[in-house]
From Swiss-Prot:
Keywords: Cell wall, Secreted. GO terms for cellular component: extracellular region. This is 44 kDa cell wall protein 2. It is found in: Secreted, Cell wall. Its main location: secreted.
Amino acid sequence: VAGKSFVPIALGRQSKQTPF
């Protein structure tokens, strides 16, 4: 899913929590 591809990365970089 492209939507779940960039969403966690953008939020993960801020939250330092990347699910991938």
